[in-house]
Curated annotation (Swiss-Prot):
Annotated keywords: Aminoacyl-tRNA synthetase, ATP-binding, Cytoplasm, Ligase, Nucleotide-binding, Protein biosynthesis
Protein name: Arginine--tRNA ligase
Gene that this polypeptide is encoded by: argS
Self-association and partners: Monomer.
An MF annotation (GO) of this entry: arginine-tRNA ligase activity
Amino acid sequence: MDTKHLIASEIQKVVPDMEQSTILSLLETPKNSSMGDLAFPAFSLAKTLRKAPQIIASDIAEQIKSDQFEKVEAVGPYVNFFLDKAAISSQVLKQVLSDGSAYATQNIGEGRNVAIDMSSPNIAKPFSIGHLRSTVIGDSLANIFDKIGYHPVKINHLGDWGKQFGMLIVAYKKWGNEEAVRAHPIDELLKLYVRINAEAETDPSVDEEAREWFRKLEANDPEATELWQWFRDESLLEFNRLYDQMNVTFDSYNGEAFYNDKMDEVLELLESKNLLVESKGAQVVNLEKYGIEHPALIKKSDGATLYITRDLAAALYRKRTYDFAKSIYVVGNEQSAHFKQLKAVLKEMDYDWSDDMTHVPFGLVTKGGAKLSTRKGNVILLEPTVAEAINRAASQIEAKNPNLADKDKVAQAVGVGAIKFYDLKTDRTNGYDFDLEAMVSFEGETGPYVQYAHARIQSILRKANFNPSNSDNYSLNDVESWEIIKLIQDFPRIIVRAADNFEPSIIAKFAINLAQCFNKYYAHTRILDEDAEISSRLALCYATATVLKESLRLLGVDAPNEM
């Protein structure tokens, strides 16, 4: 039982009419540790108990008797709890040393599936930093849900269909060189895509020609299909090379094209439920009763289906295939109206499981404050960026530890980890400005800072030749080790909070906090002094390293043992 639940259960013994969940929500962490580890404000009980909060606080403090507390005292309207540092540190250290990397593993999900729609880059366009957020947020959420007992299903819903393929075919037929495309597929296709979009801005006929080629593609025209398949195959080769470098895997690559033959069923279902309404020649579903002003456009007047029709087919397919407990869409903020419509249409179709679908939006990545755009050629490509991050990490490692073995492997872990961590430490709905120098820094709130704290602890443990043992009686009661113990004890709750909020930044901030606490401890404590507490201090080091490594793993970041 964590300390908050312990305190809540003790308070409930004194005030049985109060729900434990209410008590938990009221508990506060005092700004000053001299006021205790946790405090309970008695204001909310004044009305029911018809007493002053100060008297209620005093009554509660007097009645609580537990050997888990050093003392419980009332200060004004607050009940302040001082936890028994020695007893709790002993429990926490034994638990982590016993569980190892499985510490904080929970079975909330009971093996149920969580479908995660993530990454989803567009075929024939380079994998840019703009795609990074969906990829690393989705990957981290998969790790987090796995940790609490769910079975994540990672779906790369590739952007492999749409009018842009009409544009690309027009561009290739105008200016394309097969040899050049085969040699450098993505680079060459990007040049063609940017060039055709620039021409379309001054020549309206380009758009019409692109629409015509896309219509041919929809009708399975052999030439259009062959070009489309080629663009797709070449792009996937490049994407998979990058995913390997980022250590990201998927369970499904079913993209937009996969649902081409599954949309007729959606239209039939909507018709059978009398949900389709004609509007200016198009077919729509009205959603006003859900507070959505604009109807969902299902089929255009020219018979073309739309993005939402495809997503309806995908939602039905995923429910039937995975029977998900949750279905998460890790897609940018700008798509929020689309996902509100998607859920509302499914609700209209009487699919109550639409309540289990969640859009997990995120903010934009900018460069120098400017929005990135593939179409305009203003883009930061991931591959050269990762290479530069690894080089920067390598030069810092060379300066810090020139004799390090496996320098290249460590530089890879630090460089790739730096990019991932910087993205994930940002509150998901906020954007951030891309700054590689800040990302790869060993100072400040960065991935390398946390990795370095972990490597430093491993160095201490090697020097001491520490072997964890559950038979030892580990116990600490100094202030600085107590700050670390409280964080480690809180780790299971932190993971659940990150899952509940679909927010990996909660884990990243926890890891930064734990690394900072340990570095402070390291600066003020002679860890290797041969005295009665040396084994307890080393156990604390071991537990901290275990939790730091697991925090980083949940973010998809490696933790080298040496840096």
